[in-house]
A protein has these predicted regions:
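Catalytic phosphate/metal-binding cores of nucleic-acid and nucleotide-processing enzymes, i.e., regions
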Residues: 1-132
Length: 132
């Protein structure tokens, strides 16, 4: 039997604490996404952030439509200091694909902040390392 996770204390002062999201084997990346988005949205250095959906579908007329682009981070946004933010969310054992690593490198090379996050602790650590 798994031990129950307790609510984590606030990582960012007076903001609402990010909570560890219990993970199951069915959708570990979805649980990570919820946890990471909450941590980003509650961080005082983040002006805004949104999930980037990507994929494809076939319309009623049979036309194949793609949206998003290959390698784009799962979450994009902007820091309050104006820098672009890109976060690739991964499950505990997930690995970056080469095009995802290239996208994050491009963001960092242009002066933005780009990183991989698996949980709220990763968000806190990465943002602390790039904020004065």
């Amino acid at each position: 039997m798994r031990a129950k996770h307790q609510e984590q204390p606030s990582l960012f002062g007076d903001t609402e604490p990010a909570q560890h999201v219990p993970r199951t084997n069915e959708r570990p990346e979805a649980a990570a996404m919820m946890e990471v988005l909450r941590a980003l949205r509650n961080h005082p250095a983040v002006a805004w952030c949104e999930r980037q959906n990507s994929g494809a579908f076939r319309t009623e007329t049979g036309q194949f439509v793609r949206f998003g682009w290959k390698g784009c981070a799962d979450v994009i946004g902007q820091l309050r200091d104006g820098r672009f933010l890109a976060v690739e969310v991964k499950a505990p054992n997930g690995r970056l694909r080469p095009e995802q690593a290239a996208f994050l490198d491009q963001v960092r090379g242009a002066g933005g902040v780009g990183f991989v996050a698996r949980n709220c602790a990763d968000v806190a650590r990465e943002l602390a390392s790039c904020i004065n």
